[in-house]
């Protein structure tokens, strides 16, 4: 798309506004103005389609668009003259009236020729080309799925590479606010010009946080010209402030060389094989990290570096600027009012003053605008006063942003604001498991799950976090452990900025802003006094006994341990956290970690929620100290190691109050241990994405309190034991993507409280006749080709909904 196309669209819009004014105020031009108004309004959707299509038109059609641009430009100047003409100057009014009639004829004649036929043909070609690219994505994903099928789920680098390549091929549609402004189009043109005029090299996109650097980079990744130039060989990686450089180097090596990412990475030169490749490195913080990631000498390789700092040569760097005043007002109004202009009757000066306080920064405009949505003018005045007083001594945009973001939190109630600040406990550029977040809010703020979810949605609506799009989100029986939220770096900086105020021992949240090799020095310098923090978040690499020092947390209720290593010594001070309710242990390394000093769990008598991710689950025995108040346990990407298989093991003695057990993506789980059926307090059991699970225990009927049973995406599971039909309280059964299952248990009709069955992508050939007795059933999700099996049940059970779902394959679980 040429820049001319964009301005043609803008001028058409302005011309329409002026023609509307003329048609209602200037009687001599009224009829002509109305005709022009109808004419231009009819072609504006077509101009808009061309404007945003991304198609680079041939030269002769560019010339024709240029002619239209000139005509509309003349029309705008003419309407300016009409609106400024005096009523007593009859000669000038008659002259202008004739010119308007001539303008109407010119545009009308222009539309009668074949120009728009040709242009619409180009739009048609774009659609056809998009269809081809979607087919290519489908075929590429099929290849990725085949690769994943031959790998272990915890396999590390090669799977991460597959995930990143799938991300690089992803086609998305963002909302209007993400693609806002002429600046984005100009930025794309300038960056493409830099990259296309070279045979490779390192180029940069720089600018302050929240200005739209990543948005521009993602638009370039999806740009048709860029994809054609690099023949879809594009890798997009997020580096972050505390990167795992060696893993990233392996991913880049695998992408450029075609070898497996796990292979050694030699520093050597390679001959040019004619294949151009693009590596986009987002959120790079240091020159050292950039040098390490661009040390390969591959001819034809282009690297695009996205950073808040200028890390590349000035002549090869595009500086993303803030929005112009008009663009800023339009974006602000879109977020505050749901439209791109100030509504009639609302104080224009007030809107402009508040928007101007955001200094053209897109993120500040979006967050501040969303926070004012639906608020009265007096509230706006109060916000304006607070913003105007927030100018820091340092006049940089970064400093102003944090103060403006803080003002955006003023209309949140204290609990919602606290929940926002809790987000600073998670590492940057990592997806936050929704289940972990909800559990923390429930335990820390004494709210129930429904209120926690409402706060989540509220923060999302105010653009203070990004909630992943998932059709299950918010449904009654939805699982949250494989749904994620994300947060922009600047918003995380705000949470850290507010949480880290004051003396370190007096903070409610003790947080590490980024990954470090050791604990922060000021923590050790102040460890002679206890810490009052309720949330403690530690983000390190491998930790041994000597790296920990003594600390006291008498009020700590939440502990989050993020690390990247294959072995990890748990901090000894956990044993003194007598109030600890939630423990989250996440290994971001490439293989499961062995945890040492698990014996300290014996002192966690109040622990209610335990999340273990990518670790070896310790062996359980009858001598294991019971966790008497543990209600929820999640084992994600873990090695189970037959932890529950000890002869005579009474799991109920160890976890007497466990109500929710999740085992997800654990590739060494072959059979569900029968000892788990001793957990008579269990109300929710989720065994999901376990590729080797082939057998369920025969004594499932012992789980008399069970209400939710999820068994989805277990491809080796061939049968469901009949004992499932002896679960009197079961309300939800999910067996979707269990492709080896061929039937439901014959006596499923005994489940008198069963409300919902999800059986997508199951190869069923029949349905049990007893299903007509499922009088509480209200929702069945199945494939289109088996929906007919439920017609008889649909007639027998009033209010039953049979939903024929489309097949959906996802690699989202690989995203981290």
UniProtKB/Swiss-Prot annotation:
Coiled coil: 95-111, 399-415
Every RPW8 domain range: 1-149
Keyword Nucleotide-binding: yes
GO cellular component, one term: apoplast
Biological processes annotated in GO: defense response to bacterium
Pfam families per UniProt: LRR_Zer-1, NB-ARC, RPW8
LRR repeats: 681-704, 705-727, 729-751, 753-774
Keywords tagged on the record: ATP-binding, Coiled coil, Leucine-rich repeat, Nucleotide-binding, Plant defense, Repeat
Domain NB-ARC: 191-443
PROSITE patterns listed in its UniProt record: RPW8 (PS51153)
Domain observations: The LRR repeats probably act as specificity determinant of pathogen recognition.
Family: Belongs to the disease resistance NB-LRR family.
PANTHER family with a match to the protein in the record: PLANT BROAD-SPECTRUM MILDEW RESISTANCE PROTEIN RPW8 (PTHR36766), TIR-NBS TYPE DISEASE RESISTANCE PROTEIN-RELATED (PTHR36766:SF30)
Job of this protein: Probable disease resistance protein.
Protein name per the record: Probable disease resistance protein At4g33300
Taxonomy of the source species: Eukaryota, Viridiplantae, Streptophyta, Embryophyta, Tracheophyta
């Amino acid at each position: 798309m040429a820049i001319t196309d964009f301005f043609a669209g803008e001028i058409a819009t302005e011309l329409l506004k002026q023609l509307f004014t003329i048609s209602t105020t200037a009687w001599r031009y009224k009829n002509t103005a109305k005709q022009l108004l109808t004419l231009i309004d009819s072609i504006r959707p077509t101009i808009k389609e061309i404007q945003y299509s991304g198609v680079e038109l041939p030269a002769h059609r560019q010339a024709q668009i240029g002619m239209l641009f000139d005509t509309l430009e003349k029309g705008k100047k003419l309407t300016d003259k009409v609106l400024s003409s005096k009523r007593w100057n009859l000669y000038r009014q008659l002259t202008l009236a004739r010119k308007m009639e001539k303008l109407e004829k010119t545009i009308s004649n222009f539309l009668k020729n074949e120009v728009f036929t040709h242009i619409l043909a180009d739009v048609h070609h774009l659609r056809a080309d998009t269809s081809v690219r979607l087919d290519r994505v489908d075929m590429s994903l099929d290849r990725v799925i085949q690769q994943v099928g031959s790998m272990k789920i915890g396999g590390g680098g090669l799977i991460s590479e597959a995930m990143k390549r799938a991300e690089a091929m992803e086609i998305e549609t963002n909302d209007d606010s993400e693609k806002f402004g002429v600046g984005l189009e100009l930025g794309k043109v300038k960056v493409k010009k830099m990259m296309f005029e070279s045979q490779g090299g390192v180029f940069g996109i720089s600018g302050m946080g929240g200005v739209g650097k990543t948005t521009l980079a993602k638009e370039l990744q999806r740009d048709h010209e860029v994809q054609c130039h690099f023949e879809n060989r594009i890798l997009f990686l997020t580096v972050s402030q505390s990167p795992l450089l060696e893993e990233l180097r392996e991913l880049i090596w695998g992408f450029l060389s075609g070898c497996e990412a796990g292979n050694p990475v030699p520093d050597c030169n390679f001959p040019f094989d004619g294949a151009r490749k693009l590596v986009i490195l987002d959120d790079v913080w240091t020159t050292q990290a950039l040098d390490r990631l661009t040390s390969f000498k591959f001819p034809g390789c282009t690297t695009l570096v996205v950073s808040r700092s200028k890390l590349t040569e000035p002549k090869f760097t595009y500086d993303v600027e803030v929005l112009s005043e008009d663009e800023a007002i339009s974006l602000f109004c879109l977020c505050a009012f749901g439209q791109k202009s100030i509504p009639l009757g609302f104080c224009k000066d007030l809107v402009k003053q508040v928007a101007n306080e955001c200094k053209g920064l897109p993120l500040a405009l979006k967050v501040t605008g969303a926070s004012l949505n639906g608020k009265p003018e007096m509230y706006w005045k109060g916000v304006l006063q607070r913003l105007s007083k927030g100018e820091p001594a340092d006049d940089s945009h970064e400093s102003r942003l944090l103060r403006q973001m803080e003002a955006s939190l003023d209309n949140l109630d204290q609990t919602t604001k606290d929940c926002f600040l809790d987000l600073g406990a998670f590492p940057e550029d990592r997806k936050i498991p929704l289940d972990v977040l909800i559990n923390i809010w429930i335990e820390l703020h004494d709210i129930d799950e429904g209120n926690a979810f409402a706060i989540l949605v509220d923060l999302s609506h105010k653009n203070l976090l990004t909630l992943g799009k998932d059709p299950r989100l918010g449904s009654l029986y939805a699982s949250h452990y494989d749904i994620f939220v994300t947060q922009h770096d600047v918003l995380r900086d705000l949470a850290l900025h507010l949480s880290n105020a004051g003396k370190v021992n007096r903070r409610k949240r003790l947080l590490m802003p980024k990954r470090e090799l050791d604990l922060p020095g000021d923590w050790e310098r102040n460890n002679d006094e206890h810490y009052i923090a309720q949330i403690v978040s530690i983000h390190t690499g491998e930790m041994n006994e000597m790296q920990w020092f003594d600390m006291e947390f008498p009020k700590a209720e939440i502990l989050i341990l993020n690390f990247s290593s294959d072995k990890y010594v748990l901090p000894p001070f956990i044993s003194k956290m007598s109030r600890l309710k939630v423990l989250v242990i996440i290994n971001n390394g490439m293989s499961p970690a062995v945890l040492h000093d698990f014996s300290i769990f014996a002192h966690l008598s109040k622990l209610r929620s335990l999340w273990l991710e990518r670790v070896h689950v310790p062996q359980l025995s009858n001598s294991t100290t019971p966790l008497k108040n543990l209600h929820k346990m999640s084992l994600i990407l873990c090695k189970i190691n037959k932890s529950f298989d000890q002869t005579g093991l009474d799991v109920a003695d160890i976890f007497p109050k466990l109500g929710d057990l999740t085992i997800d993506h654990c590739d060494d789980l072959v059979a569900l241990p029968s000892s788990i059926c001793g957990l008579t307090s269990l109300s929710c059991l989720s065994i999901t994405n376990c590729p080797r699970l082939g057998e369920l225990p025969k004594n499932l009927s012992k789980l008399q309190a069970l209400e939710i049973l999820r068994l989805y995406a277990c491809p080796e599971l061939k049968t469901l034991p009949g004992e499932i039909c002896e679960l009197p309280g079961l309300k939800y059964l999910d067996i979707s993507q269990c492709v080896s299952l061929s039937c439901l248990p014959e006596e499923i009709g005994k489940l008198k409280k069963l409300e919902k069955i999800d059986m997508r992508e199951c190869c069923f050939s029949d349905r049990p006749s007893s299903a007509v007795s499922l009088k509480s059933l209200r929702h069945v999700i199945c494939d289109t080709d088996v929906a007919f099996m439920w017609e008889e049940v649909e007639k027998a059970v009033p209010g039953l909904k049979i939903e024929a779902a489309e097949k959906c394959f996802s690699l989202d679980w690989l995203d981290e």
